[in-house]
Structure formats: structure tokens, C-alpha cells
């Protein structure tokens, strides 16, 4: 991977700001998208036991945390050229048995959600920046499995 640019980091940050503009709504978009593609993912998230509920603070907190991690991943890539995930993230994902196909479902849901959040500001360049940031975050989480 080439260097993550300042512009790419700014694009990721702008999508984060758009997401923060309506976290409950975009959390619903995100988790609904995940469950449409992988209904069994419901078992990985305790707060989805009763479906996607925008008033559930755990649902919105988890979405906000994940989207924030992608933003942080972009910042790490720009500053250091690599992403280091907290060992606890690796541990919980390992315990839950999260696999590559599930990381892909989350990535697709993240992109779909942020595309809706940014509206007509969506570009291929933004998509690429988000994909790089997410992919490097996912790789760092998987590396922390050990």
C-alpha cells in the first residue's frame, strides 16, 4: 500500500462528521445492512437480540465506536503508515469467532451507511480511502487475535 495521504484522511474525517450528524439513523442503516446480508450476525451482537432498535444506546454506542475506529485507523495510517489495534479488540473478535467473510459484511455495511450519510459528496476517492482505513483496521484486529 502506498502512503495514506492527508486528503484521504480528510475524506475519512468528513464521512465521520456526516455520520455523527445522525448517529441513531445511521446506526439503523448500518446494522440493518449487516443483518440483511448475514442474519446470523445477530448472534454476535447482544444488543441485536430484539432486532435493530434505534433507541438502544448499546446499538448506537457500538456503531459510533466502530466508525470512530475507522477514523482513527485513517489517522494512524497517515501518521505512521500502519494501524495497531488494541489487544482487547483482537481478543473479543477472536472469542466471537469473527471470520474474514464477516469482516467483509461489516465493510460493505459501513460503506453503504457512509454513502448515505455523505450523500452527493460520495466519490470513488472517498470510497477508496474508507476501504483502505477499514481493511487496515480489520487486519490489525485479526493480527491481535494471537
Swiss-Prot record:
<dbReference type="GO" id="GO:0046872">
    <property type="term" value="F:metal ion binding"/>
</dbReference>
<feature type="modified residue" description="Nitrated tyrosine">
    <location>
        <position position="31"/>
    </location>
</feature>
<dbReference type="GO" id="GO:0009877">
    <property type="term" value="P:nodulation"/>
</dbReference>
<feature type="binding site">
    <location>
        <position position="46"/>
    </location>
    <ligand>
        <name>heme b</name>
    </ligand>
</feature>
<dbReference type="GO" id="GO:0005829">
    <property type="term" value="C:cytosol"/>
</dbReference>
<dbReference type="GO" id="GO:0005634">
    <property type="term" value="C:nucleus"/>
</dbReference>
<comment type="subunit">
    <text>Monomer.</text>
</comment>
<feature type="binding site" description="proximal binding residue">
    <location>
        <position position="93"/>
    </location>
    <ligand>
        <name>heme b</name>
    </ligand>
</feature>
<keyword id="KW-0944">Nitration</keyword>
<dbReference type="GO" id="GO:0020037">
    <property type="term" value="F:heme binding"/>
</dbReference>
<keyword id="KW-0597">Phosphoprotein</keyword>
<keyword id="KW-0536">Nodulation</keyword>
<dbReference type="InterPro" id="IPR001032">
    <property type="entry name" value="Leghaemoglobin-like"/>
</dbReference>
<keyword id="KW-0539">Nucleus</keyword>
<keyword id="KW-0535">Nitrogen fixation</keyword>
<dbReference type="Pfam" id="PF00042">
    <property type="entry name" value="Globin"/>
</dbReference>
<dbReference type="GO" id="GO:0019825">
    <property type="term" value="F:oxygen binding"/>
</dbReference>
<feature type="domain" description="Globin">
    <location>
        <begin position="3"/>
        <end position="146"/>
    </location>
</feature>
<dbReference type="InterPro" id="IPR009050">
    <property type="entry name" value="Globin-like_sf"/>
</dbReference>
<comment type="function">
    <text>Leghemoglobin that reversibly binds oxygen O(2) through a pentacoordinated heme iron. In root nodules, facilitates the diffusion of oxygen to the bacteroids while preventing the bacterial nitrogenase from being inactivated by buffering dioxygen, nitric oxide and carbon monoxide, and promoting the formation of reactive oxygen species (ROS, e.g. H(2)O(2)). This role is essential for symbiotic nitrogen fixation (SNF).</text>
</comment>
<feature type="modified residue" description="Phosphoserine">
    <location>
        <position position="46"/>
    </location>
</feature>
<feature type="modified residue" description="Nitrated tyrosine">
    <location>
        <position position="134"/>
    </location>
</feature>
<protein>
    <recommendedName>
        <fullName>Leghemoglobin alpha</fullName>
    </recommendedName>
</protein>
<feature type="modified residue" description="Nitrated tyrosine">
    <location>
        <position position="26"/>
    </location>
</feature>
<keyword id="KW-0561">Oxygen transport</keyword>
<dbReference type="InterPro" id="IPR019824">
    <property type="entry name" value="Leghaemoglobin_Fe_BS"/>
</dbReference>
<dbReference type="GO" id="GO:0005344">
    <property type="term" value="F:oxygen carrier activity"/>
</dbReference>
<keyword id="KW-0349">Heme</keyword>
<keyword id="KW-0479">Metal-binding</keyword>
<keyword id="KW-0813">Transport</keyword>
<dbReference type="InterPro" id="IPR012292">
    <property type="entry name" value="Globin/Proto"/>
</dbReference>
<feature type="binding site">
    <location>
        <position position="96"/>
    </location>
    <ligand>
        <name>heme b</name>
    </ligand>
</feature>
<dbReference type="InterPro" id="IPR000971">
    <property type="entry name" value="Globin"/>
</dbReference>
<keyword id="KW-0408">Iron</keyword>
<feature type="binding site">
    <location>
        <position position="62"/>
    </location>
    <ligand>
        <name>O2</name>
    </ligand>
</feature>
<keyword id="KW-0963">Cytoplasm</keyword>
<comment type="similarity">
    <text>Belongs to the plant globin family.</text>
</comment>
Amino acid at each position: 500500500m502506498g502512503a495514506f495521504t492527508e486528503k484521504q484522511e480528510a475524506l475519512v474525517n468528513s464521512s465521520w462528521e456526516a455520520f455523527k450528524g445522525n448517529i441513531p439513523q445511521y446506526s439503523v442503516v448500518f446494522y440493518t445492512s449487516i443483518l440483511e446480508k448475514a442474519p446470523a450476525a445477530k448472534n454476535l451482537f447482544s444488543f441485536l437480540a430484539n432486532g435493530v432498535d434505534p433507541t438502544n444506546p448499546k446499538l448506537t454506542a457500538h456503531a459510533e465506536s466502530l466508525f470512530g475506529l475507522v477514523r482513527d485507523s485513517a489517522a494512524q495510517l497517515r501518521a505512521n503508515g500502519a494501524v495497531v489495534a488494541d489487544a482487547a479488540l483482537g481478543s473479543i473478535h477472536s472469542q466471537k469467532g469473527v471470520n474474514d467473510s464477516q469482516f467483509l459484511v461489516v465493510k460493505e455495511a459501513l460503506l453503504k451507511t457512509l454513502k448515505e450519510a455523505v450523500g452527493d459528496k460520495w466519490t470513488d476517492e472517498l470510497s477508496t480511502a474508507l476501504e483502505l482505513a477499514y481493511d487496515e483496521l480489520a487486519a490489525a484486529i485479526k493480527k491481535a487475535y494471537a
